[in-house]
């Protein structure tokens, strides 16, 4: 909750202008409004509107383009829309019926230049081979700053959905130099339908992911603004066998803008040592001899 004298002059802005949300599910609208009220925000703009419908241009012309500083979103997965009712400006970015692609395009439009977003998407967005999939990923890389991708384990949304997902972290405008990846394998809860809290070391990668993201941000800021040493970035995030690593945008472009973490993560396999075949054969022959002796003893008993 926002309290204290320092924030008092901004109370009206916090209550009426800072927070916005759009949905056409009335239950979600009520939940969102209650969440805002419980956090001390009584006048948040939680509005009944299909964000992808062409009516958004008429109902909220100011908000549908170049308006928001920050967008956090968990859009519906794997839906399909009739193009005739979809915002034509969004279709101008990516020609598709798939809602998971359209929402990312819509968010790009709604952000101000320099605005930032964190968006949860199904894994298919990262590696889909259709023209629309590749077009959207190219847009994120070439005309915006795709800063990071956090790969999530498949059970994080159980019992409601078991689909594998990832978080896209991007800034509108500019161009991408490199993309930071994090292979998050545990979020502090079991990955079954019960989602029970886990205790002990290794049960939650989130604190490490946040720490590594902050470290990466500091290094990239130093590199871009202060002429930092690129070798420092390479030393810290160049090892693709680790959970956190970075990939140059040129390498991604040469891979048809594939953004799946498994495309770039390197797995080190421990080398197995096997006994000499002659030793194994000798052991098998000894076992066979022992078995034959036991069979003869059994035959004598009969």
Question: What is the predicted role of each segment?
Answer:
Residues 53-54, 60-223, 230-302:
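A conserved structural/catalytic subdomain of Rossmann-like adenosyl-cofactor enzymes
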Residues 1-70, 78-80, 101, 122-123, ...:
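Conserved S-adenosyl-L-methionine
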């Amino acid at each position: 909750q926002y309290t204290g004298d320092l924030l008092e002059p901004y109370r009206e802005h916090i209550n009426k202008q800072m927070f916005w949300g759009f949905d056409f599910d009335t239950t979600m609208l009520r939940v969102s409004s209650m969440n805002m009220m419980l956090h001390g925000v009584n006048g948040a703009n939680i509005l009944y509107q299909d964000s992808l419908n062409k009516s958004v241009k008429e109902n909220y012309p100011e908000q549908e383009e170049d308006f928001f500083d920050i967008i956090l979103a968990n859009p519906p997965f794997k839906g399909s829309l009739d193009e005739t009712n979809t915002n034509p400006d969004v279709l101008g970015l990516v020609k598709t019926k798939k809602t998971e692609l359209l929402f990312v395009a819509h968010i790009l439009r709604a952000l101000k230049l320099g605005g930032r977003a964190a968006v949860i998407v199904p894994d298919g967005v990262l590696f889909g081979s259709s023209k629309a999939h590749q077009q959207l990923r190219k847009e994120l890389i070439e005309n915006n700053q795709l800063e990071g991708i956090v790969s999530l384990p498949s059970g994080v949304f159980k019992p409601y959905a078991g689909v594998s997902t990832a978080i896209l972290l991007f800034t509108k405008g500019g161009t991408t130099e490199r993309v930071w990846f994090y292979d998050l394998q545990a979020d502090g809860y079991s990955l079954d339908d019960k989602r029970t809290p886990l205790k002990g070391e290794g049960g939650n990668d989130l604190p490490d992911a946040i720490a590594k993201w902050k470290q990466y941000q500091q290094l990239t800021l130093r590199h871009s603004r202060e002429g930092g040493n690129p070798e420092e970035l390479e030393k810290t995030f160049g090892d693709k066998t680790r959970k956190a690593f970075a990939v140059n945008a040129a390498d991604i472009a040469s891979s048809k803008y594939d953004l799946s973490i498994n495309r770039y993560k390197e797995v080190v396999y421990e080398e197995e040592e096997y006994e000499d075949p002659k030793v194994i054969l000798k052991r098998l022959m000894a076992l066979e001899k022992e078995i034959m002796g036991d069979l003869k003893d059994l035959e004598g008993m009969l």
